Amino acid sequence: MNFNKKTIEDIQVKGKKVLVRCDFNVPLKDGVITDENRLNGALPTIKYLVENGAKVILCSHMGKPKGEPKPELSLAPVAKRLSELLGKEIKFAPDNTVVGENAKAAVAEMKDGDVVLLENTRYRKEETKNGEEFSKELASLAEIFVNDAFGTAHRAHCSTVGVTDYIDTAVCGYLIQKELKFLGNAVETPEKPFVAILGGAKVSDKIAVINNLLDKVDTIIIGGGMAYTFLKAQGYEIGTSLVEEDRLDYAKEMIAKAEEKSVKFLLPVDHRVAAEFKDVEATVTNDQNIPTGNMGLDIGPKTETVYANAIKDAKTVIWNGPMGVFEFENFNKGTIAVAKAMADSNATTIIGGGDSAAAVNILGFGDKMTHISTGGGASLEFLEGKVLPGISALND
């Protein structure tokens, strides 16, 4: 995939109508936005366009309204809060058809530097099917398309891909530019030693990532529920821990492949365990084996040291997926240890979105990381080496 895409700075935007696909899929509680990270992430691109005299038309999805208007998933609260953050009025066009009379009238009245926000693009059934009609309607509003929603870049929808069939100038905003710079460089030209840390519950979710990264990394660190499938494949006792029986052969194969490529494949050497899936006091095992009747819920203290040392020696580190059941206070120690080791390191540190991003932010290490990806599924597909339709649709 080509990572050198044209950006907003490569084109003339003054006086032009610019449709910007943002990611405003934010959590709401009683109409109030509870996490503003994505709004703040969109500001640099919006500010640049406003300051350079563009007529800025913003669009985004929120939640899964399943192709029909749901008042609780309206973007009205986003328009209100974004206006405050931007320090400038954003006109909201409340059309259930997204591109309706309100939107057309609002866009027709725009002056240079004005901002309009359209309604939730997923109010339209065709959005997720990349339907031609809705793509044309969105495109009819603008002369330039800017994609700045990395979180949906792996989806071929009307507002991410379809519009580019009808608008010739399609470029990326600052957010996608940053994702391409850090994730793209890490995957294609990382500074070595390159360490990938993979956690989370299932091996099956990370198969393609491990496959792709084995050709690029020096060390792979495995934690979370997926570690027990690898340990069982090597003959260790795992008690009642999570295991994917149908992936044991694959796990053996991966370990052999890593050895063949001289990639260090680090698995836990001890665990924090409990008799049931509850936030109870942890018992620490002596070694890789987990006693009968117990389940592994986090990596142990010896493992933390081994993993921290591997991170300390790295020049590039990518992390995707927690080391244990992070929601339980007794079993979040491994995740904290990895986050701390990354925060203390001099390497380029990249958090691959999703749970790891949430963990790092909750722990207060967010500002110590080089880059925290804004895409969960998109980051994973990127690390799998897949072409992301929302990126490939933009001008080279």
Curated annotation (Swiss-Prot):
Location within or outside the cell: Cytoplasm
Residues reported in the UniProt entry to bind ATP: 206, 296, 327, 353-356
Keyword Iron-sulfur found: no
Entry's EC annotation: 2.7.2.3
Pfam families reported in the protein's UniProt record: PGK
Biological pathway: Carbohydrate degradation; glycolysis; pyruvate from D-glyceraldehyde 3-phosphate: step 2/5
Residues that, per the record, bind substrate: 23-25, 38, 61-64, 122, 155
EC top class named in words: transferase
SUPFAM superfamilies attached to this UniProt entry: Phosphoglycerate kinase
The keyword S-adenosyl-L-methionine is annotated on this UniProt entry: no
GO MF terms, alphabetically ordered: ADP binding; ATP binding; phosphoglycerate kinase activity
Keywords, ordered alphabetically: ATP-binding, Cytoplasm, Glycolysis, Kinase, Nucleotide-binding, Transferase
Any single GO CC term annotated in Swiss-Prot or TrEMBL for this entry: cytosol
InterPro entries xrefs: Phosphoglycerate_kinase (IPR001576), Phosphoglycerate_kinase_CS (IPR015911), Phosphoglycerate_kinase_N (IPR015824), Phosphoglycerate_kinase_sf (IPR036043)
Catalytic activity: (2R)-3-phosphoglycerate + ATP = (2R)-3-phospho-glyceroyl phosphate + ADP
GO BP terms: gluconeogenesis; glycolytic process
Subunit text: Monomer.
Family, per entry: Belongs to the phosphoglycerate kinase family.
UniProt cross-references to PANTHER family, sorted A to Z: PHOSPHOGLYCERATE KINASE (PTHR11406), PHOSPHOGLYCERATE KINASE 1, CHLOROPLASTIC-RELATED (PTHR11406:SF23)
UniProt name for this protein: Phosphoglycerate kinase
Organism for this UniProt entry: Clostridium botulinum (strain Eklund 17B / Type B)
Lineage: Bacteria, Bacillati, Bacillota, Clostridia, Eubacteriales
